[in-house]
């Protein structure tokens, strides 16, 4: 049973050197930005009971979850989402609200083979709990824009949508669940022809304002002109209020000087069913992939306890790293300046010398070889020009000049030993 021992499971990969460093840096900068804005950290387990994700409407397809059994035979999953476990934490305890929380961790979701998506990704995010007005959405968007700015992410945009508008249309036109799932894909993919055929097959009246709004929905993306178009076709107070929320957000962000980062897309519909109002997606132009997603979910926490309004968003750390790699110079591993070769009974002196050299700005390594010749060979292979040997009674510095030559000698006990 060793067929797969040299391979990674589908949708996973190894991260090496630069990517590990960048992932850590991105997570840390996001974390610090969110902490500076008053968010408090929450960590949830990597594994959760299946029941946490199995409530009404199943916001995450069962087939997308990695499932297994615990020692008592209960079904456990690798968390496929960060927001739902946070909703469990908030719903099962009593809190003083408003509450602002932040998190970071790995998410596991089985995507279709050859979809180009990874099944394990890193997400960092924020949630504002207990506030049902537009200030919560604005706080989230400001926070993520400032975080992306600090990461020096270039050419990004945050799209604002409104899932409540879509839900109002579906309700008013009495479209049942199966049809709604098909309709959703047409609108999300901006498949105008398929949407037009859907309206024809359903024999919907194209003169009706709501039907006209439905047909226009995938085209309603851009700036405030989009809002004006939607307002003309809104046939209920609920629709008008949903549109007004997006308008207020957009105008506020423009006033704050963030208008260049914001656009409107009323045809955007999140694939997770727990969203109830304003939704967000963020993109970087260069890679064309989603880097931010989220929205308002006023009914989710109620599945675990007291119903509380909430809004949040997640940053896709792996996609940020991909963008930063394309923006930056090719990665070079840290160059070693000096290798210290030592006899084992002189390790303490060698370690003191290493610390001293690092304080002087030198990248000094302790050799892992017992033979000096092997240390020399390692140094040459890695283009390191200096080797210091800590012998029984003294230090010897070797430099490469077509061959290894002795540069200077000093007493081992002399902690102030300096290289040129």
Swiss-Prot record:
- Summary of subunit composition and partner proteins: Heteromultimer composed of HisG and HisZ subunits.
Provide a Gene Ontology MF annotation, just one: transferase activity
* InterPro entries, alphabetized: aa-tRNA-synth_II, aa-tRNA-synth_II/BPL/LPL, HisRS-like_core, HisRS/HisZ, HisZ
Q: Which domain of life is it from?
A: Bacteria
Enumerate the UniProt keywords alphabetically: Amino-acid biosynthesis, Cytoplasm, Histidine biosynthesis
Q: Name one GO cellular component term.
A: cytoplasm
Q: Which organism is it from?
A: Bacillus cereus (strain G9842)
Where does the record say this protein resides? Cytoplasm
What more does the entry say?
This function is generally fulfilled by the C-terminal part of HisG, which is missing in some bacteria such as this one.
Its pathway?
A: Amino-acid biosynthesis; L-histidine biosynthesis; L-histidine from 5-phospho-alpha-D-ribose 1-diphosphate: step 1/9
Instruction: Name the protein family.
Output: Belongs to the class-II aminoacyl-tRNA synthetase family. HisZ subfamily.
Q: What's one Pfam family the UniProt record gives for this protein?
A: tRNA-synt_His
The Gene Ontology biological process terms listed for this entry are: histidyl-tRNA aminoacylation; L-histidine biosynthetic process
What's this chain's function? Required for the first step of histidine biosynthesis. May allow the feedback regulation of ATP phosphoribosyltransferase activity by histidine.
Known CDD domains for this protein? HisRS-like_core (cd00773)
User: What gene name does this entry carry?
Assistant: hisZ
Q: Which HAMAP family match?
A: HisZ
Q: What is this protein called?
A: ATP phosphoribosyltransferase regulatory subunit
NCBIfam families in the cross-refs: hisZ_biosyn_reg (TIGR00443), PRK12292.1-6 (NF008938)
